[in-house]
Amino acid sequence: MTPLSSPLSQYWQTVVERLPEGFTETSLSVQAKSVLTFSDFALDSVIAHPEWLAELESASPQADEWRHYAGWLQEALAGVCDDASLMRELRFFRRRIMVRIAWAQTLSLVDDETILQQLSHLAETLIVGARDWLYAACCREWGTPCNPQGVPQPLLILGMGKLGGGELNFSSDIDLIFAWPEHGETRGGRRELDNAQFFTRLGQRLIKALDQPTMDGFVYRVDMRLRPFGDSGPLVLSFAALEDYYQEQGRDWERYAMVKARLMGDNDDAWSRELRAMLRPFVFRRYIDFSVIQSLRNMKGMIAREVRRRGLKDNIKLGAGGIREIEFIVQVFQLIRGGREPSLQSRSLLPTLDAIAALHLLPENDVAQLRMAYLFLRRLENLLQSINDEQTQTLPADDLNRARLAWGMKAENWPQLVGELTDHMANVRRVFNELIGDDEADTPQEEERSEPWREVWQDALQEDDSTPVLAHLADEDRRQVLTLIADFRKELDKRPIGPRGRQVLDQLMPHLLADVCSREDAAVTLSRITPLLAGIVTRTTYLELLSEFPGALKHLIMLCAASPMIASQLARYPLLLDELLDPGTLYQPTATDAYRDELRQYLLRVPEEDEEQQLEALRQFKQAQLLRIAAADIAGTLPVMKVSDHLTWLAEAMIDAVVQQAWTQMVARYGQPAHLDERQGRGFAVVGYGKLGGWELGYSSDLDLIFLHDCPMDVMTNGEREIDGRQFYLRLAQRIMHLFSTRTSSGILYEVDARLRPSGAAGMLVTSADAFADYQQHEAWTWEHQALVRARVVYGDPQLTSQFDTVRRTIMTTARDGKTLQTEVREMREKMRAHLGNKHRDRFDIKADEGGITDIEFIAQYLVLRYAHEKPKLTRWSDNVRILELLAQNGIMDEHEAQALTVAYTTLRDELHHLALQELPGHVAQTCFSKERALVQASWRKWLVAV
């Protein structure tokens, strides 16, 4: 074996001082000295358990010892009598075996492929051992789950990702999906449970046994977000539910994830065979599927954006030419041809590479280079993680860990290791780009067009010198353009830009100036773009993005020219520049029913336990989607109603994710309220009022929300830290408000206003559904009933949603005195106008002035409250356009008036959207919209002025 390098020999003296009693420097073998110097994890472990070191010194780990893991664990669990002792034994066993694997890996006693197998077998052994012990315990407590024929039902566990592929890294999360075969009930227990409840409780206990940190550490971080519907879906699904989901709703990325899916503890019984057969058609298509390339290209772009977003330098997994790109290369062939070529259906990467070579899908030399690069990168990754049992793929910056890795990788020193790594990653990147790369390049014509602007940029030409290229501009615009360029150059002198940044900027600016200055509005556009550039000049990756992708630069210029709001957003949040890379998605917002799924996929890249990154990711997703909606709005591909629909669906997806995150955090701390043991759902609802409730959000709208629960009195939570159930829901609502309003580097998520709750700011933040109903019936003012017209549940389980809808319908269909209602609605409108009146009397406030949007909303609300007791169908919708439609359909308002009000309403809202894109206030000249205003005022007089 390789002797320790000089830096590590020096560090050995520090190790000696920490050796457990009974071990001396002279009593240890060279092997022990090497491992304990290399890995702090191994050193800490043998200090706590000196017998492990003696065991390793007497008999080295063997390549095939994974075959004994199940037997060893069975012995360890033989005396376990409760969940606490189970958790202790699982953690003890995992640490002991991980030390053995670290020993074998550091000393190269077994090859790197075997190390990956051992790590995967260990995880599988622990998962299956914990499941089987807990299944038996749950059966003793609640009976055995059976189908209607009385056949016992098992819990099947799909290991995803590297666990499924038998390629787990040293310190890794495990991605799991739980399933059970058939519906039914438990038999033989103290009381019957349906199978869904049984397996959900079993799944929760299994996750806790593996994932929960204790004084002994944890076994594995368990990630369940790959299951159907992610965190918002059931924890465990029946086979039928799984099949329905993957047939009807399975996404491309879920198909890729399923390639590596493997049943944990698969004994090839009938249930296992059924599940495998059910999933196979979803993963491997019978035809050759070339759509995969674009889907994987999109995923590649997502990862590239992630690297930029998080500043992931020196990342051997996600960086260019890293492990993820090798995985993508292999998946391309699996997903295109796997349905026709069984040899490509392997879950493991290296056997699939062999199949790719055998089928001549890649040149032999490329396959050989990919194999060498993969084994090199995986060894480097595992060594890096085994130093501290830490989940990282980023190369270290300190000298000690660099010396450790250089020695472990058999390099003379760190520079030599980096050189070898660079060569391997360059080979991977080359093959990757040839296969699915889509980098753009300048054409000779573009170079020729930008050449005169190189002089303008680099030589700081005076006005006379630059006249030919700016001749099409007016004198004032020409002077302004040159001043902007000169001021920008002065600003750059104050910034710490490195040589690479200067070089990229000098490549970029001639192209940018050529495009901007060919426009009639060159001065305005350049004035919006230079602040953005000033903000990113020290972040070379963004300059490179604009320089290397001319299409992205063109879209940047077009959008900044069209909207100062977009320019401001891009300047404030440069990561949004990534959205400019794909015009196919930039001007085509996410489908209205797909926001939740896209957000779920986006959040999967962020560790579930990292709250800070989760908050950032939520904000970044929202900003990216807002940009796409605004771009489509500017391009004219989205009418005003659709703009608001998209903004509303986006907000609902964000609400869903925030509630999920808050719920997860609260349940981890307190458990869940015990009344939920007897029912599905969370007993919690979020009601949207105002623009959210009415599907009418604008670009900068806040969210009017109230929170409801159905928790009975005297219910406690079932966690280790018990609290009152209603207190749980109050803290949940407070947590939700916190997650929305916390300001991160990406800003806040939404401004949230909860003052529409019963008793307003003086009332409880969260209200029971019964108390809400009582308040609405006996205490609420007329204006609160008006607000209820535009209210709907935006998050909640079906039971609470139905309860709220019943309350809303009951209130709205209550018979009212027409004159009294007319007076109260009119007086409320007059109060609003006095309080929020237009301060610019020479301007028309589109929302607040007479004949504006609010008048139309009040007309609709008044008519619903006035006539819904006769025409209950008026309560169906919460948005003004469909309410006006209902009023016409039910004979309350004639069709011509309803249509005219609808046109006026959408016209005024369209103008508000476009003013927002221009960062202008919501008022216009008094002469504007005179026809619409006159029509609205006439309708107001007809319905709301007493006769």
UniProtKB/Swiss-Prot annotation:
Name the UniProt record assigns to this protein: Bifunctional glutamine synthetase adenylyltransferase/adenylyl-removing enzyme
GO BP term, example: regulation of glutamine family amino acid metabolic process
Intrachain S-S bonds: none
Classification of source organism: Bacteria, Pseudomonadati, Pseudomonadota, Gammaproteobacteria, Enterobacterales
Protein family (similarity comment): Belongs to the GlnE family.
UniProt-annotated stretches for the region Adenylyl transferase: 450-947
Ribonucleoprotein keyword on record: no
Taxonomic superkingdom: Bacteria
GO cellular component: cytosol
PANTHER family from the UniProt entry: BIFUNCTIONAL GLUTAMINE SYNTHETASE ADENYLYLTRANSFERASE_ADENYLYL-REMOVING ENZYME (PTHR30621:SF0), GLUTAMINE SYNTHETASE ADENYLYLTRANSFERASE (PTHR30621)
